[in-house]
Amino acid sequence: MSSGKVVQVIGPVVDVQFPLSESLPDIDDALKVKREDGTELVIEVALELGDGIMRTVAMDSTDGLKRGAEVEGTGASISVPVGKDTLGRVFNVLGNTIDNGPEFDEDHPRNPIHRDAPKYDQLSTGIEILETGIKVIDLLAPYIKGGKIGLFGGAGVGKTVLIQELIHNIAQEHNGISVFTGVGERTREGNDLYFEMKESGVLEKTAMVFGQMNEPPGARMRVALTGLTLAEYFRDVEGQDVLLFIDNIFRFTQAGSEVSALLGRIPSAVGYQPTLATEMGQLQERITSTKKGSVTSIQAVYVPADDYTDPAPATTFAHLDATTNLERSLTQQGIYPAVDPLASTSSALTPEIVGEEHYEVATEVQHVLQRYRELQDIISILGMDELSDEEKIIVARARRIQFFLSQNFHVAEQFTGNPGSYVPVEETVKGFKEILEGKYDNLPEEAFRLVGGIEDVVEKAKKLAGNN
């Protein structure tokens, strides 16, 4: 293995000089360097500067590094443990366990985090819907097995809670395996998620990988690849359908932009790295269905200042099959999950994939909600009395639909005190069809808020009538 010396440290970026007589390490190779206190730091080769100098990115803090420190090549890229033993465990970017449990042996199967996307002849072309049990998603923006789904929303609108609910529903109802990757988010949230999942029994079906806010950009930039490598093993070797959760894909881009300038690259639009589209493509192209199994990815996308034209969310958009847009105005009305029924989209919402009835009900729901949105200006200026009888019916049904799109979550039970609900797709379609037909026009609007199926609405209406 080639060995060199540290010649410069600029924050998370370390320059290493190798003797010209030796072969240089490859791009993306992992190198090891000892700090003054004897601890080991892993750095990854990013660029060759010439004269035997390689510019690298550190996977941990560079505190305690000094010029002249010995650097050893490993001859390979970072590799992480894979297999069934990873379920129920928590890892960092390097594949080291961080849950106080036993470490994995050196001879445990490991895969490199840098890999090529599956070849075209390995890809599966069939389309299958993934039922989530969340009404607004299953009805208006259904998820595809092996697809890529974006959860868009600003700060504090409920992206992480929605992800937790999806993990819960997939584990409990579908017995599915999930890999949760925390990229640059709050450590407290990761900690809470771990203990909540342990309590609810979901953890045995989930592997967790974290590179949180307090970690250097190198770790945040590579941790998504670590999570993806774990998921790929279950797809390619075990032949399973895996859910890969990434919270938050924006932080992956943000970490790349933090190191980009230090690596000497000229920034592009809004200060992002010029390699933004390439980095995103290398990650996203590996997330797909093959003939052996599938990786379905659900990615929370933080939208800076709620600006969807920002290059980071805009680049992510290009790769997605479905989008779930969370809207702050809905949280203010107490509608949870705060999914915007008109802005959320899915390429699977076609009669050929979801069926004729589902498609017709979904488009009619969107039509009624769109008409209600148009009428709101008239209502706010002139009041309800100025509407025609037909428009009054549309408004009444739209409000019932809007409330019926909300539901209680299992993972929020401890905060709300209300039990969560899982609603099968057939029941969801049936409920909305009956509301559109006017079957429940006589029930109070409040009966539709935060309930499961349509039977729950009737029950709640009886309770409300009893209380009055």
Swiss-Prot record:
It is an enzyme of class 7 (translocase). It catalyses: ATP + H2O + 4 H(+)(in) = ADP + phosphate + 5 H(+)(out). GO terms for cellular component: plasma membrane; proton-transporting ATP synthase complex. ATP binds at G153, G154, A155, G156, V157, G158, K159, T160. It is a peripheral membrane protein. GO terms for molecular function: ATP binding; ATP hydrolysis activity; proton-transporting ATP synthase activity, rotational mechanism. PROSITE patterns: ATPASE_ALPHA_BETA. Its EC number is 7.1.2.2. CDD domains: ATP-synt_F1_beta_C, ATP-synt_F1_beta_N, F1-ATPase_beta_CD. Coiled coil: none annotated. It is found in: Cell membrane. Keywords: ATP synthesis, ATP-binding, Cell membrane, CF(1), Hydrogen ion transport, Ion transport, Membrane, Nucleotide-binding, Translocase, Transport. HAMAP family: ATP_synth_beta_bact. F-type ATPases have 2 components, CF(1) - the catalytic core - and CF(0) - the membrane proton channel. CF(1) has five subunits: alpha(3), beta(3), gamma(1), delta(1), epsilon(1). CF(0) has three main subunits: a(1), b(2) and c(9-12). The alpha and beta chains form an alternating ring which encloses part of the gamma chain. CF(1) is attached to CF(0) by a central stalk formed by the gamma and epsilon chains, while a peripheral stalk is formed by the delta and b chains. Belongs to the ATPase alpha/beta chains family. Produces ATP from ADP in the presence of a proton gradient across the membrane. The catalytic sites are hosted primarily by the beta subunits. This is ATP synthase subunit beta. The gene is atpD.
